Amino acid sequence: MATKIRLKRQGKKFYAFYRVVVVDSRKKRDGKVIEEIGTYNPNTQPSTIQIKSDRAQYWLGVGAQPSEPVFKLLNITGDWQKYKGLEGAEGTLKTVEAGPDAEARIAAVENQAQKLKAAKAEAAAKAKAEAEAAAAAEEAPAEEAAEEAPAED
């Protein structure tokens, strides 16, 4: 059986991602596959390439021919160099640098929440103090008016 390692298209219009599959060369592009050996998502930065190296080595060893796009992916991951016994078997796959630690992000969010709570409490205390001052100011003129008025006997 003539086998090929090629891409099977998934996803929706204008947002395709692919599965790297081993398939009989006479089957349709998205037809029945023998084995799925990886995925490729060109929509992420950098592109996500995940290929099961041992399975790719096996299928290359038994004569499966990679398509041109899969050949390029195998070169990037270093699987083709391993199969051929060439230098550079570690591949040139780029990885996303790890962002800030999750715990650090959680701590930052909690710190910001504490600041917001403190600001709200301070604003509420200030509003309460102003309300009390206004109430005291209203009572003071009422008392002065009572003192100034002549007492009725």
Curated annotation (Swiss-Prot):
Compositional bias (Basic and acidic residues) at which positions? 121-131
Q: Which domain of life is it from?
A: Bacteria
This protein's GO cellular component annotations are: cytoplasm; small ribosomal subunit
Q: What is the native source organism of this protein?
A: Bifidobacterium longum (strain DJO10A)
Any one GO MF annotation of this record: structural constituent of ribosome
Stretches with biased composition (Acidic residues): 140-153
Q: Which SUPFAM superfamilies match?
A: Ribosomal protein S16 (SSF54565)
Q: Does the keyword Ribosomal protein apply?
A: yes
Question: What protein does this entry describe?
Answer: Small ribosomal subunit protein bS16
